C-alpha cells in the first residue's frame, strides 16, 4: 500500500516541473500575436551546451531556464589592443581597437564568448523560472530572417563590461515578430539592445529593466552610455513599460528608418542625455513616459518626433494611435522641448498599438515591476 500510494504523489510532484512555468500575458504593441514555441512541451536544458543547441535548432521549443547558465569561460579568451579613449582611470571603459590614434593603448585579454551572441532560431519561447533564469557572459542574437520568438523573465549580464565591443545583450538584424518582456540586462560591454541595419519588424520590448549601473563606463562614473542603438532601415519597435536606469546616452539612439512608439517608460538617473539620433528618417511618438533626474531629455536628434508636451496637443495622436496620447512627465530633469511633428503618423497604419496609462501611473509602477522576477 505504501508503494502504490507513493507513486501518485511522485507523479504529482513531477508534473508541475514543465507546466508551472509558462508565458505570462501576451504581447502588446507591434509584436501582438507572437506565439514563440507555442504549445511545445516546456524543457529545462541541463547545461550551456544543451541550451545553445536548443536555441539554435529548427524545432519549435519552450525553453525554461531554472539556474544561471554561465558562458563566460566557455570559448576561452582573446587578447589584443585596447584604447583608453575616455580616460585612464580605474572606472573608464576601454575600446577593443587596433588603431588608438592619440589615445593611450595597451594589451588586454577578454572572454571570447561575450563578443558574439547565440543565434536564436524561429519559433522559440525562452522563459525564466522565478528569479533564477540567468544567461551570463553571452547575449542573444535575432537575425537573418528569424521570427516568432518570445523571451520572458530572464537576465542577461556580464559581457566583458570593461571593454567596448565586449558584447551586446540582445542584437536584432533582419528579424520579425519578437517580444522581449521582463528581461533584465546588466554590465554589458557594449549595447543592452542593438538593432542593426537590416529591417526588424513587429518588435515589442516591454517591462524590461535596463540596468545601466556598471563598474566601467565611457564617463568613468558608473553610468553606461551604450543603451539602445536603433539604426534599422525600416524597423518597427514598441518600447513599453521599461525602466531605464543610470544611463548617459543612446536612451535610445533613434536613427535609420526606425518607427518607434515609446509608451509608459521611466528613465531615472541619466547624467548625459536620453534621446539622440542622426538620421532624418527616424520617427518616434513618446507618450505617457516619465523622466526623473535626466540631465538632457533630447540631445542631438535629426528625425521626426512627437512627444505629447501638453494636453492640448495630445489629441493629435488620434490619427496615428486611434486615441489621444498621454502627456509625458518630467521631474528633476532638463526641459522637455515640445516636438509636435505629425507628418509621419500615417506610418502607424496597420500596426497594433500598445495601450497607455498616465505618466504618473507609470512612474509609480514601472520601476517596481520591470525586469526578471517581477511577473
UniProtKB/Swiss-Prot annotation:
Protein location: Secreted
Lipoprotein recorded as keyword: no
Protein name according to UniProt: Probable pectin lyase C
Record gene name: pelC
InterPro entries: Pec_lyase (IPR002022), Pectin_lyas_fold (IPR012334), Pectin_lyase_fold/virulence (IPR011050), PEL (IPR045032)
Keyword annotations of the record: Carbohydrate metabolism, Cell wall biogenesis/degradation, Disulfide bond, Lyase, Polysaccharide degradation, Secreted, Signal
Family: Belongs to the polysaccharide lyase 1 family.
UniProt-listed Enzyme Commission number(s): 4.2.2.10
Function, as annotated: Pectinolytic enzymes consist of four classes of enzymes: pectin lyase, polygalacturonase, pectin methylesterase and rhamnogalacturonase. Among pectinolytic enzymes, pectin lyase is the most important in depolymerization of pectin, since it cleaves internal glycosidic bonds of highly methylated pectins.
S-S bridge residues: 83-100, 92-220, 317-325
UniProt keyword Endoplasmic reticulum present: no
Species this chain originates from: Aspergillus oryzae (strain ATCC 42149 / RIB 40) (Yellow koji mold)
Catalytic site positions: 250
Catalysed reaction, written as an equation: Eliminative cleavage of (1->4)-alpha-D-galacturonan methyl ester to give oligosaccharides with 4-deoxy-6-O-methyl-alpha-D-galact-4-enuronosyl groups at their non-reducing ends
Amino acid at each position: 500500500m505504501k508503494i502504490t500510494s507513493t507513486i501518485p504523489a511522485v507523479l504529482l510532484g513531477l508534473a508541475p516541473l514543465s507546466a508551472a512555468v509558462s508565458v505570462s500575458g501576451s504581447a502588446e504593441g507591434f509584436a501582438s500575436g507572437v506565439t514563440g514555441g507555442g504549445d511545445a512541451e516546456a524543457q529545462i536544458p541541463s547545461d550551456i551546451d544543451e541550451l545553445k543547441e536548443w536555441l539554435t535548432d529548427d524545432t519549435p521549443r519552450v525553453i525554461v531556464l531554472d539556474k544561471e547558465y554561465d558562458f563566460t569561460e566557455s570559448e576561452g579568451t582573446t587578447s589584443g589592443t585596447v584604447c583608453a579613449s575616455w580616460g585612464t582611470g580605474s572606472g573608464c571603459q576601454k575600446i577593443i581597437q587596433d588603431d588608438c590614434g592619440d589615445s593611450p593603448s595597451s594589451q588586454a585579454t577578454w572572454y571570447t564568448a561575450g563578443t558574439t551572441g547565440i543565434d536564436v532560431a524561429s519559433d522559440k519561447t525562452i522563459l525564466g523560472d522565478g528569479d533564477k533564469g540567468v544567461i551570463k557572459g553571452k547575449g542573444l542574437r535575432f537575425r537573418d530572417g528569424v521570427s516568432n520568438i518570445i523571451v520572458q523573465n530572464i537576465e542577461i549580464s556580464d559581457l566583458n563590461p570593461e571593454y567596448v565591443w565586449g558584447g551586446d545583450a540582445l542584437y536584432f538584424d533582419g528579424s520579425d515578430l519578437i517580444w522581449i518582456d521582463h528581461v533584465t540586462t546588466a554590465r554589458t560591454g557594449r549595447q543592452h539592445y542593438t538593432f542593426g541595419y537590416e529591417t526588424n519588424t513587429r518588435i515589442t520590448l516591454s517591462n524590461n529593466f535596463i540596468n545601466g549601473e556598471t563598474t566601467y563606463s565611457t564617463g568613468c562614473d558608473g553610468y553606461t552610455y551604450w543603451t539602445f542603438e536603433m539604426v534599422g532601415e525600416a524597423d518597427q519597435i514598441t518600447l513599453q513599460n521599461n525602466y531605464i536606469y543610470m544611463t548617459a546616452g543612446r536612451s535610445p539612439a533613434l536613427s535609420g528608418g526606425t518607427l518607434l512608439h515609446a509608451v509608459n517608460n521611466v528613465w531615472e538617473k541619466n547624467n548625459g542625455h536620453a534621446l539622440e539620433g542622426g538620421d532624418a528618417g527616424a520617427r518616434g511618438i513618446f507618450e505617457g513616459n516619465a523622466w526623473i533626474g535626466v540631465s538632457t531629455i533630447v540631445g542631438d536628434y535629426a528625425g521626426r518626433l512627437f512627444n505629447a508636451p501638453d494636453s492640448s496637443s495630445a489629441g493629435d495622436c488620434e490619427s496615428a494611435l486611434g486615441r489621444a496620447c498621454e502627456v509625458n512627465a518630467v521631474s528633476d530633469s532638463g526641459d522637455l522641448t515640445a516636438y509636435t511633428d505629425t507628418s509621419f503618423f500615417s506610418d502607424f497604419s496597420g500596426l497594433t498599438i500598445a495601450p497607455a496609462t498616465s505618466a504618473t501611473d507609470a512612474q509609480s509602477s514601472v520601476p517596481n515591476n520591470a525586469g526578471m522576477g517581477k511577473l
